[in-house]
Amino acid sequence: MSCMNYASRLSKNEYKGPLGEEEFFEDTEEEKKKVKELIEKIRSSEYIVVHSGAGISTSSGLQDFRGPTGIWTNEHLNELKNKKKRNHDFKDNKRKLKSNDINCKNTSDMCSPSFFHKEKKENTLNIVKRERYYNEDNVDMNACNERVVHPNHVYVNHEDDNNNNNNNNNNDNNLYNNVYNSVGSNDHTNKESILIKKENNSENVRKDIHDKVNTKNVKKIDVKETNNLDPENYVIFGKRKKKVIELHLALPSKTHIMINELINKNIIKFMITQNIDSLHHRCGKHFSKTAEIHGNIFTERCDFCGRRYLRDYLISTISFKPTGSLCFLCSFPPIGVCTDVLLDWNNSYEEFFHLNSIKHSQIADFHFCLGSSFYIVPASSYPSKKKYANANSYSCVINYQKSFLSKEVNLNIHSNVNNISDIIIKEFSLNPLSIRSARITIVRCPINTLDVICDKLISIHNIKMKHKSMRQHSIDYSQMGNKDEKYNNEKYVKRNMTECLYYNKEGECYEKRKYKLMEKKFFPNNQQNEFIPNRINIFEQKFHEHNNNNNNNNNNNNNNNNNNNNNNNNNNNNNNNNNNSSSSIDSSCSINSNYHISKNINPDFSFVENQSNIYENYKEQTFILICPMIINIKTVRLESFHKVYIKLLDDIKGLWFIKTNFSCILEVELWYHSFILLKLDFNKSDPFIQLNAWNVNVAYTYGDDIDDFDYFKNDENIKKPFNLYKNKYISNMRREGHVNNLYTLDNEKVKSNTSNNNNNNNNNNNNNNNNNNNNNNNNNNNNNNNNNNNNNNNNNDNNNNNISDHNIYDDHNNNNNKNHNNYDKDNSNESYYCSEILNEHVHVGYNPNNYEPNCKVYILAYLDNLRTRNINNNVNNNNFSRFNLTQSCKLLYNIYCVLNKDNEQKKNSTIKETYDKLDYFIKNFDFNRDSCLYTNNFINMLIQNERHGNQSRYKFRERRKRLLNDYSSCSSDDDQSGKNIFIFYNLYMNQYKKKEDNEINDIYKKYDVHEKNIYDESKQYVHKVRVRTDLINHKSVYKILKNNYLVNINNMKLMEKKNNSEKLFLINDKDNNSLLSINNKENFNCIPSRQNNVKKNSEYMHEEENNKTNSNENIARLNNNDFIQVMETEKQKKYNSFDKYNSDRSSINDTFDEIKYNKNNDNNNDDNNYDDNKNDDDNNNDDNNNNDDNNNNDDNNNNDDNNNGYIYSPVLFINKKFKLGELVYKIPKYVKPQKIYTPYKKISRNKKYSNTLQKDRYEKWKMLYEELINNENKTYIIDSVLYKEISYLPYWILNYVNDLFECM
């Protein structure tokens, strides 16, 4: 978007100052004298304040406002041109009407009375027609009156004018041209004698452009070309011209670099700018030394805390309206609504910047004014000695045109600002280099945790389903996003097959898919008599035109061969899953997996993988990537069972959703023709949310005026030393001669061979799953190998059969290289890296001076879990500083990990109970259309859905009392009519549509939910969640039994046995000698060790791992008043789903003195934790005035104590090269914005929490966390709001880190 788009947002204002004034140019000798005086004044001044305008950005390709090709100047010229054209067309049409009414009379009509009543004066056209009538078109044009040639007008010959009109498509013909064209073809006049006046000639504005143009780095401009310049596409500054570029692609000029370097050297104390292009901040962030009095088109401001964020994308609103973003630093969960900071004509200056500008203007002894005419008030008042400037101060103005302050300034220089800035840079030995970098933030999380990622993905409207209707009807989920269609359980969907086209960001269709809903009957234990009710599954097929083979009827059903105790002997009886079409690489059908529903037809997320062993080995993971500078992403697959799905969720913010089941490489195209290779590391054994932030250079500039650089044209001749087929990973994996064959996915032979080998691949992977015990210590993707050397002999035979088939891709494979193709061979040892960008895989597109830095990319930050590894062993820890997250973020992080960890226990004796979260989520939920949460467009969607009707206008508090169905406030102007009403969160105000109490009571009875639990608070939506029991095995977690006896449950297998009355868990020891049933309600619980609600009558039992003892030998009877507690001290093993923690103590018969001593220490630590949590929650509070270093030191000292109450301890590590913004830790009190969109009275502040919402959510999350830990084997019904908050955590963390780096 150019500056013209910004100017069109402004309201109409007639007076904009003088437009298109004459420009002046200094002589060379006089300019040298003035520049020398300027440099001496800069050296001698003590307090310099810079006043900058739009003139310093014209060399960057941005238009000014009052220059020769300024925005307002072009508007004024266009208005005059249109006005003249309308007047000319009106007169011309009037003449034509009169000429058509003229009837040439015969001599017999001359006696009529009408002939004598004609006017004496006739038009010349009538005379010509009359002469042509009588003289038979032989008219002497020399009889016409001679034309008067005005000395001040510009005339051209007729032929030249016709040539110019044909070349320029400019049909502004004047009256003389119309007269000549009306003569006809029988014309014998001298055309050279006819002079035609040039209307709106550009030479009248700039007469010397074609004569005195500077030819350095500029194409030669012809006279005709200068006359044909489109002022909206080119900007003219001085004697130069440059093509207009977009605002987000503009690079800093030499003037911006000079100001930034002088601020770094403390020569310039303060800067007051009228520009909205943020080029000053692109050089470096100096919020406390900069006053943007007119706002910034890239900046958002939180309406709750006042923090400002510098975005890489343009803000679409003006006059402090909500943008759709939320502030993640002032509160977690986010509560602050972000607005723009652009001023309209009717808006006054922000008080913070206005007071700062007055303060520094009064102190300054030198006012350095650059590129502004100062016709806007009060911007012109700051350097004026008649207003705020000191009377004894010195002032200098550098501008081509005369300014409003020309009469009172001490030094006027009419010259190019960049030329003078270049001299200053050399005199003060400044660094002229400016680096434009892109920040790429990546989050990796398990696939089943993003059922509800954002409303652009999932929006469910008018879905009313009861208990059994969900599984009885075929529903086309791909059409649920359409708001105009309503689905219920009484209607069948007529369209069973839906074709979806995939388009990239440039609008090119690159893939076609069709989706179908399938109904499968599931027969457990190979018994055809019993079957589970029908399950609706989304079935994905990729159809290719060259193959029309239909093998859908030959699909094999998935059979569970898992019996209670006899499945160990039936490992090889697993049936192969279906590969539905010979042309389909990724065809799949599922029974037990999760599926996703999208608002639009998003087939990338509407798929279910099959339950074959190959899929279990290659489970998928989700990567969320955000970077507004990304243009396109490309990738390839190494094997047929590798899957990569890429979807652009938000085009403005650059939010990408990537789902894959292997480590893949992405070729990412950025702005300025820059390219990178991004490697996404797949690690299925990692249940945590991991984050990496990278800083990549995309452009280098020295402020040179490089003209007409096309940022959008894709140059095919760009020479980058890497691509998807030739890079460091590929060269280490294969020879270059076979790389192209590996990635030729469009080859029909490869596809057909791949589809024919799918069954063999499934068989081999089944064999691998039966022997995973030998491969536990391998790398993540080494479990994907079909040819595993540790397999049994029977499996080796099967694998050898597949080697010959797999040689289609690679002919030079031998027995020593039997692994599948992957990128994990060069993985780094840093397990906290979920991605990788090498310096060799970065191509900087805009580098006119061929600058070669040592490092073009570096990791900016990463999120690590301290509980899983020792931080002292981190080699790169010295280059990073710790930034502790808030307690509410840590608490939600722990809940997320507990609930969403994949249960990878490979116990063949247990029945795999499938659970589809989204299935139950849809079945029990009835969404309102206004339930849009945490998305970029949620405000706009709510505004569009708002129905005003005949609703009277009244203020916020009256509206809150009278209407209870929403939580809203009026817009900025309550008195103006026609304003849209902004609806605030109805999420936290419990304003959802309520269900009937009978349905809720049935759910409570079914799932045994108590009234004290937090998840039945709202009593409208519930969600079923099963706690991952394997996550509770931690050193701060203990087993508790509320009976009078203790049982050793080590090395026992749990089997859930369904009964009519209650659920029982059968505990078998290792030798199957004893069997004990424990009630789920009373006996089996676990709680964290450090909690405030520890009761004295609690009975603790330590979980230990002893392979030699049985359960009957370790039974101890204790009284209610006895207290047993055992501390675990052995180091933690590598984390996975069934790791357990050993202990130094092999029995529970410890002395009571030591136990009481440990109890007292825990109670003391609890008190300390309360104070530390209080300090940590105040970290992001507005009243917190701590510095960066002090805060980090305190967090480092108190980190261990603060996190003892949680299982996991996430910490963000930030590279020391990057300095966080000033507003991250400290916000001046007078920066507070107006209280318009955030309900301050409802959400007040206190000392411990930033607002009451954070306190409320923290308390509810705390209660939920305690319930999950205390009852590990219990199935819970969680409120829909809490479930959405848990599902949104990866998206929240992504935005939290992004706001952390964009904060000014």
From Swiss-Prot:
The keyword Metal-binding applies. Keywords: Metal-binding, NAD, Transferase, Zinc. One of its GO terms (biological process) is regulation of DNA-templated transcription. Residues 548-585, 756-806, 1182-1203 have a biased composition (Low complexity). Residues 545-585, 749-827, 1154-1203 are annotated as: Disordered. InterPro entries: DHS-like_NAD/FAD-binding_dom, Sirtuin, Ssirtuin_cat_dom. One of its GO terms (molecular function) is metal ion binding. NAD(+) binds at residues 53-72, 274-277, 371-373, 399-401, 417. SUPFAM superfamilies: DHS-like NAD/FAD-binding domain. Residues 28-466 form the Deacetylase sirtuin-type domain. Pfam families: SIR2. Binds 1 zinc ion per subunit. Zn(2+) binds at residues 302, 305, 327, 330. Its cofactor is Zn(2+). It catalyses: N(6)-acetyl-L-lysyl-[protein] + NAD(+) + H2O = 2''-O-acetyl-ADP-D-ribose + nicotinamide + L-lysyl-[protein]. Its EC number is 2.3.1.286. It comes from the Eukaryota. It is an enzyme of class 2 (transferase). The active site is at residue 294. Belongs to the sirtuin family. Class IV subfamily. PANTHER family: GATA ZINC FINGER DOMAIN-CONTAINING PROTEIN 4-RELATED (PTHR36911:SF3), LIM ZINC-BINDING DOMAIN-CONTAINING PROTEIN-RELATED (PTHR36911). Regulates the expression of the surface antigen-coding var genes central to the malaria pathogenesis. Cooperates with Sir2A to mediate silencing and mutual exclusive expression of only 1 of the 60 subtelomeric var genes at a time, coding for functionally different but epitopically variant versions of the erythrocyte membrane protein 1 (PfEMP1) molecule, to evade the detection by host immune surveillance. This is NAD-dependent protein deacetylase Sir2B. The gene is Sir2B.
